[in-house]
């Protein structure tokens, strides 16, 4: 027999940003426990609301299946001595099984005969083991800071108030986290029944929705919020900004979602929309509304946790809450504009970037110089890049950014425009932080690009330079900064070398850095970011490793190599040539002497080695234009033509000949062959 199983843990308010993660982990952990216990079932569904985590298991077996456990002992040849008496090994094994040697069965295999112990194990009832399984699943949740409550010694992410475990209509008795299982379930704080009893697992979650006014199905709540918010925005002629992270957080904050629309005074629209949106989304968890031209409208959408008979009062209440925050933004905006950004530059002396690396003013000076250098390399306006670098961090000293930290950069752009700075300079103040996350847009112009790269490189080199390379945590977001630099160079195709960029950035720190290997460490770190990035892009690890083996420090060049090797791998000749390169590498690794640069044609004896020597010579000359222009795909496509002469060489030529001169000449030929491929990648690392 199989029944539906329910477990619900009633808690105090769970952290909204962690609710989905907790619920999914609970389900995954519990399913793993069920499989480990060999309890048949047809799937686990999770439920999550602000004050509960729950699971329902479909068709959970009422008990484990009976099974026969076999334990193999020593081979019969080792189990008995010459007189046929059990050896100590056999006796020890039998004792461990709880039997005597003569009670053991025999197992015959192709490799011989063995002692065997068979034991019939009766399956345990689910009701007797499921409590422990659930407790283990909860104990392994990803909880960074568990807490204790009352006088209990148990710990969980929040205090636990109720526990319900039902197998069909049967109550599973037991205790988890200091709370005994019962049929009592708590409803909504302000609507429905505060507490009620549940008769069977099948009633969940419908009974909770009907009697408790709690929608336990997380995805259903989210779907309602999305659909109703879109309708509400359309009703005022707009489109709701339904950023998924915020939708997830709001879904995790409400038990009974009611979507409402409110408004604010149009005069606030004179303030840059980013500041208003920061207030609405960050502080109040509201959804802004835009028109079809992406212009902010004087409306916002919010999700109430109660179904009020007078929703207008709920709307008015939220409008009253947001109005002072918008007024603050307006005040800061008007006040900040009374002083030009450049006047705030000296104030950066009072803000520490990092104790050993100096103030933000020190960082600004380095960014200014480095941005000018990069601008020169990529053909951007040097003076504008330096000006943007000088102003880059000035908005950190404004009231707006001090109060609304996420507006840094974008407010600098607005203030720079107000001050009459060049448009490229103003835009760069915002775009210096791009790309902010994976998949984000890149800076839109050369000035922005120069400043963005300068800022990131300064941070990376500085932190590595004082020996604080990221290990587990990454407080300075160096991984993201590195990927940002690489993306900019690769996607814009800049012919920039990390060696030069890192060396220039290092030179600007004077004697502040203490790590003598900072340049090498930074480059190795950034090459490691290549591996992660290109794996995410779908390139296999062996292709990436084949290119990294050549340690190319020009990101755009690295990109071309990876794509070329990826194309080469699909060619018919690839597998054979990769194996040949591996073979050549192994042969050369065993040779301890020195090889000539050129082969001696007079020493060529076999037709196959003559053919390969001629092919390598012709190919070397033919590939010069491709190598010079970085056309690696064309080069590898041509190198694929070497498959036949290479295969013929290994089939017909003894490389390690007894004649030393002959052997060295053949090794030189193979070395020249391998070097052709190594100008692009080490294809011997390619897997089948």
Curated annotation (Swiss-Prot):
InterPro entries per record: DALR_anticod-bd (IPR008909), Gly-tRNA-synth_bsu (IPR015944), Gly-tRNA-synth_heterodimer (IPR006194)
A single Gene Ontology CC term: cytosol
PROSITE patterns in the cross-refs: AA_TRNA_LIGASE_II_GLYAB (PS50861)
Compartments where found: Cytoplasm
EC number of this enzyme: 6.1.1.14
GO MF terms held by the record: arginine-tRNA ligase activity; ATP binding; glycine-tRNA ligase activity
Reaction catalyzed: tRNA(Gly) + glycine + ATP = glycyl-tRNA(Gly) + AMP + diphosphate
Broad class of enzyme this protein falls into: ligase
Alphabetical keyword list: Aminoacyl-tRNA synthetase, ATP-binding, Cytoplasm, Ligase, Nucleotide-binding, Protein biosynthesis
Description of how the protein assembles with itself and partners: Tetramer of two alpha and two beta subunits.
PANTHER family found in the cross-reference section: GLYCINE--TRNA LIGASE, CHLOROPLASTIC_MITOCHONDRIAL 2 (PTHR30075:SF2), GLYCYL-TRNA SYNTHETASE (PTHR30075)
Family under the similarity heading: Belongs to the class-II aminoacyl-tRNA synthetase family.
The name this protein goes by in its record: Glycine--tRNA ligase beta subunit
UniProt source species: Vibrio parahaemolyticus serotype O3:K6 (strain RIMD 2210633)
């Amino acid at each position: 027999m199989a029944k539906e199983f329910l477990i619900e843990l009633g808690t105090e308010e769970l952290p909204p940003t962690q609710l989905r993660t907790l619920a999914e982990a609970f389900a995954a952990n519990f399913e793993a426990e069920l499989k480990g216990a060999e309890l048949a079932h047809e799937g686990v569904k999770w439920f999550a609301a602000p004050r509960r985590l729950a699971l329902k298991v479909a068709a959970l077996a009422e008990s484990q299946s009976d099974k026969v456990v076999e334990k193999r002992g020593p081979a019969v040849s080792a189990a008995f001595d010459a007189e046929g008496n059990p050896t100590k090994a056999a006796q020890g094994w039998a004792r461990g099984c709880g039997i005597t040697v003569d009670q053991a069965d025999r197992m015959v295999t192709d490799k011989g005969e063995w002692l065997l112990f068979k034991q019939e194990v009766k399956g345990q009832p689910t009701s007797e083991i499921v409590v422990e399984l659930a407790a283990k699943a909860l104990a392994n949740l990803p909880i960074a800071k568990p807490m204790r409550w009352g006088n209990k010694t148990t710990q969980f992410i929040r205090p636990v108030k109720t526990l319900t475990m039902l197998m069909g209509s049967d109550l599973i008795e037991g205790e988890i986290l200091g709370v005994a299982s019962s049929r009592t379930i708590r409803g909504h704080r302000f609507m429905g029944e505060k507490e009620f009893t549940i008769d069977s697992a099948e009633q969940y979650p419908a009974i909770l929705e009907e009697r408790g006014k709690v929608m336990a199905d997380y995805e259903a709540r989210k779907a309602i919020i999305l659909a109703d918010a879109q309708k509400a925005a359309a009703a005022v002629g707009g489109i709701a900004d339904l950023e998924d992270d915020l939708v997830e957080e709001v879904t995790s904050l409400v038990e009974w979602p009611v979507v409402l629309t409110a408004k604010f005074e149009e005069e606030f629209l004179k303030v840059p929309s980013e500041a208003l949106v920061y207030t609405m989304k960050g502080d109040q968890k509201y959804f802004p509304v835009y028109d079809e031209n992406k212009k902010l409208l004087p409306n916002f959408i919010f999700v109430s946790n109660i179904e009020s008979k007078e929703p207008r009062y709920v709307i008015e209440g939220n409008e009253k809450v947001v109005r002072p925050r918008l007024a603050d933004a307006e005040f800061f905006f008007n006040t900040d504009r009374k002083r030009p950004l450049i006047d705030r530059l000296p104030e950066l002396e009072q803000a520490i970037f990092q104790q050993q690396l100096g103030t933000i003013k020190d960082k600004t000076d380095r960014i200014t110089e480095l941005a000018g250098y990069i601008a020169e390399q990529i053909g951007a306006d040097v003076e504008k890049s330096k000006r943007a670098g000088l102003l880059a961090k000035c908005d950190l000293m404004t009231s707006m950014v001090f109060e609304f930290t996420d507006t840094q950069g974008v407010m600098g752009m607005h203030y720079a425009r107000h001050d009459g700075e060049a448009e490229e300079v103003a835009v760069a103040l915002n775009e210096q932080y791009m790309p902010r996350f994976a998949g984000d847009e890149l800076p839109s112009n050369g000035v922005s690009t120069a400043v963005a790269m300068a800022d990131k490189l300064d941070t990376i080199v500085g932190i590595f330079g004082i020996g604080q390379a990221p290990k587990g945590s990454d407080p300075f977001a160096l991984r993201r900064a590195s990927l940002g630099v690489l993306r900019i160079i690769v996607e814009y195709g800049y012919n920039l070398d990390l060696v030069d960029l890192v060396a220039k950035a290092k030179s600007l720190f004077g004697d502040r850095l203490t790590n003598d290997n900072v340049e090498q460490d930074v480059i190795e770190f950034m090459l490691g970011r290549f591996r992660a990035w290109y794996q995410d892009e779908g390139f296999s690890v062996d292709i990436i490793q084949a290119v990294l083996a050549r340690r190319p420090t020009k990101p755009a060049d690295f990109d071309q190599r990876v794509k070329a090797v990826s194309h080469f791998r699909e060619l018919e000749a690839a597998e054979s040539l990769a194996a040949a390169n591996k073979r050549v590498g192994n042969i050369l690794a065993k040779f301890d002497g020195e090889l000539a640069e050129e082969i001696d044609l007079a020493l060529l004896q076999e037709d196959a080695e003559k053919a390969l020597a001629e092919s390598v010579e012709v190919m070397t000359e033919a590939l010069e234009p491709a190598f010079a222009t970085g056309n690696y795909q064309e080069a590898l496509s041509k190198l694929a033509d070497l498959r036949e002469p290479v295969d013929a060489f290994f089939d017909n030529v003894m490389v390690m000949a007894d004649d030393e001169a002959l052997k060295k000449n053949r090794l030189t030929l193979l070395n020249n062959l391998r070097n052709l491929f190594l100008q692009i990648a080490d294809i011997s690392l390619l897997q089948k």
